[in-house]
């Protein structure tokens, strides 16, 4: 019998949301994504102790650079076991500074360049703030492809498409979490607000021939993944990937080009900020996500500082 994971791979590019090389190798995803939380977990693994030490020793006391070196080292190892791309995230504390985001992105891609990794195998992850989207627009023009993350609203999706970013990561599970907590309702299937958000974005992009890739992220259960089967890409935790690999039930494609979508829109900065302000869920989850990634970045810096 064919597993649901293998069925999913027929119409969706499967991406592993982890820094665990062993798990990636066994599950055979096309790509992999990392973030500060996953890097912190990897840094705490004794098997990566030498990698952490090397990152610090090569940074000459610059802890920020040491963190970037470690992120790229993890990315290099991941690229040994996936045929596609790895996403490496910029320090979340820079999320509201366009120039700083560009500079840090250029440093990350420079480290990959120095390691002999081709740019078409790396995506630089930026939070989908207005400043992050503007940074991504410039980076894309300079040949550095981006993954806009912490995406919770249709306004963010509109702005990312207009900026010509390579890929967006709408967060299914965190949207679901907010609405479940707010309403007390345990949403299932097509009624899940996170599923509805990604479906709307996917249909809008396809209807208007945007080339930006839609990669659903942050899943809480298998049903959310199944409801988005057919999405360009889905980045999935190893636990859920294993469950998909063990399930031999039938998986039907839910998303496909050709479905009805809304007319093309564009947003000025003030319109973007107003739309964000009016969306309580998106405002709260974006701020929360940036804070969480910033705290984990600080913990990673503390681990590296301890080696001084």
From Swiss-Prot:
E.C. code: 2.2.1.2
Enzyme class: transferase
Record's subcellular location: Cytoplasm
Keywords for the protein's UniProt record, in alphabetical order: Cytoplasm, Pentose shunt, Schiff base, Transferase
Active-site feature positions: 125 (schiff-base intermediate with substrate)
GO BP annotation list: carbohydrate metabolic process; pentose-phosphate shunt
Superkingdom classification of source: Bacteria
Pfam families: TAL_FSA
Major localization class: cytoplasm
Pathway: Carbohydrate degradation; pentose phosphate pathway; D-glyceraldehyde 3-phosphate and beta-D-fructose 6-phosphate from D-ribose 5-phosphate and D-xylulose 5-phosphate (non-oxidative stage): step 2/3
UniProt cross-references to PROSITE patterns, sorted A to Z: TRANSALDOLASE_1 (PS01054), TRANSALDOLASE_2 (PS00958)
Cited InterPro entries: Aldolase_TIM (IPR013785), TAL/FSA (IPR001585), Transaldolase_1 (IPR004730), Transaldolase_AS (IPR018225)
Recorded GO CC terms: cytosol
Keyword Transmembrane: no
Family annotation (SUPFAM superfamilies): Aldolase (SSF51569)
Family: Belongs to the transaldolase family. Type 1 subfamily.
Function (record text): Transaldolase is important for the balance of metabolites in the pentose-phosphate pathway.
PANTHER family noted in UniProt: TRANSALDOLASE
Subunit structure: Homodimer.
Protein's name in the database: Transaldolase
Organism: Pseudomonas savastanoi pv. phaseolicola (strain 1448A / Race 6) (Pseudomonas syringae pv. phaseolicola (strain 1448A / Race 6))
Lineage: Bacteria, Pseudomonadati, Pseudomonadota, Gammaproteobacteria, Pseudomonadales
Gene label: tal
């Amino acid at each position: 019998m064919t597993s649901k994971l293998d069925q999913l791979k027929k119409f969706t590019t499967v991406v592993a949301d982890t820094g665990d090389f062993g798990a990636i190798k066994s599950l055979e995803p096309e790509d992999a994504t990392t973030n500060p939380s996953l890097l912190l977990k990897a840094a705490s693994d004794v098997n990566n102790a030498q990698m952490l030490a090397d990152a610090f020793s090569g940074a000459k006391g610059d802890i920020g650079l040491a963190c970037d070196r470690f992120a790229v080292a993890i990315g290099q190892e991941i690229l040994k076991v996936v045929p596609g791309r790895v996403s490496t995230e910029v320090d979340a504390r820079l999320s509201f500074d366009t120039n700083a985001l560009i500079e840090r992105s250029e440093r990350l891609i420079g480290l990959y360049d120095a390691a002999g990794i081709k740019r078409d195998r790396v995506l630089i992850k930026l939070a989908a703030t207005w400043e992050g989207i503007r940074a991504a627009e410039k980076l894309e023009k300079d040949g550095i492809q981006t993954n806009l993350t912490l995406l919770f609203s249709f306004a963010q999706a509109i702005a990312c498409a207009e900026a010509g970013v390579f890929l967006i990561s709408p967060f299914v599970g965190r949207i679901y979490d907010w609405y479940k907590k707010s309403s007390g309702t345990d949403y299932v299937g097509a009624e899940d607000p996170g599923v509805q958000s990604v479906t709307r974005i996917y249909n809008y992009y396809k209807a208007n021939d945007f080339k930006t890739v839609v990669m659903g992220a942050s899943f809480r259960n298998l049903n959310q993944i199944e409801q988005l089967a057919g999405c360009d890409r889905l980045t999935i935790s190893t636990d859920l990937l294993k469950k998909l690999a063990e399930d031999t039930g039938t998986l039907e494609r839910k998303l496909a080009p050709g479905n009805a979508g809304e007319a093309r829109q564009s947003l000025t900065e003030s319109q973007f900020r107003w739309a964000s302000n009016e969306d309580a869920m998106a405002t709260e989850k974006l701020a929360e996500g940036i804070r969480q990634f910033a705290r984990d970045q600080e913990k990673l810096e503390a681990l590296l500082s301890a080696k001084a």
